[in-house]
């Protein structure tokens, strides 16, 4: 989880804004709790909700009980002291922003997203994902910042984003555990 520390460092040193969607279950050690506190102290960072459990990576069962998803979100608010109403659902590119909505191709998150929206949560998906060069890579080498930048510009130019002239990029903190990949984040 050194990636969280590296992300926070880049937000501070480069004076850029970022929103981090946190999973409460992951904040169980002294170091991880400190990373959460460091994000809270950073004026460039916004903390948002990515559920307490991350569905324990059992998404079909998780989304089959919308009320359970809602309770998991509420638990994360308490555990991490999250005040934002922004949520990203685990493993689903689902959006609920005001009257606008977009559903993930895997439709099983729709009832949960609708319930959360009804309770004044704003659900964010993503427009673009920064992935590893190869999912099977042992080095976890990331796509180059230039390739990511080109993808961002293309999506904005072609209006291939959820909201015009606004892009949400999905990254995971473990991508930046090593300093080499953290430097790629800085370059972007």
Where do the protein language model's features map onto the residues?
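Catalytic grooves of carbohydrate-active enzymes
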Residues: 145, 149-188
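Boundary/entry segment of secreted carbohydrate-active catalytic domains
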Residues: 1-6
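Metal-dependent polysaccharide deacetylase catalytic core of the NodB/CE4 family, i.e.
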Residues: 12-144, 162-169
């Amino acid at each position: 989880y050194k990636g969280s520390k590296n992300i926070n460092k880049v937000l501070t040193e480069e004076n850029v804004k970022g929103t981090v969607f946190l999973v409460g279950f992951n904040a169980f050690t002294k170091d991880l709790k400190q990373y959460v506190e460091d994000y809270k102290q950073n004026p460039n960072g916004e903390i948002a909700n990515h559920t307490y459990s991350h569905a324990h990576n059992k998404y079909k069962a998780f989304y089959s009980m919308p009320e359970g998803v809602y309770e998991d979100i509420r638990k994360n608010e308490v555990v991490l002291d999250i005040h934002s109403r922004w949520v990203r659902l685990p493993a689903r590119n689902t959006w609920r922003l005001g009257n606008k909505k977009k559903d993930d191709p895997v439709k099983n998150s729709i009832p949960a997203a609708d319930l959360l929206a009804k309770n004044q949560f704003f659900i964010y998906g993503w427009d673009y994902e920064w992935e590893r060069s190869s999912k099977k890579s042992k080095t976890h080498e990331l796509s180059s910042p230039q390739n990511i930048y080109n993808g961002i510009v293309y999506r904005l130019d072609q209006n291939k984003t959820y909201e015009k002239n606004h892009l949400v990029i999905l990254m995971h903190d473990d991508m930046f555990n090593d300093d080499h990949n953290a430097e790629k984040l800085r370059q972007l």
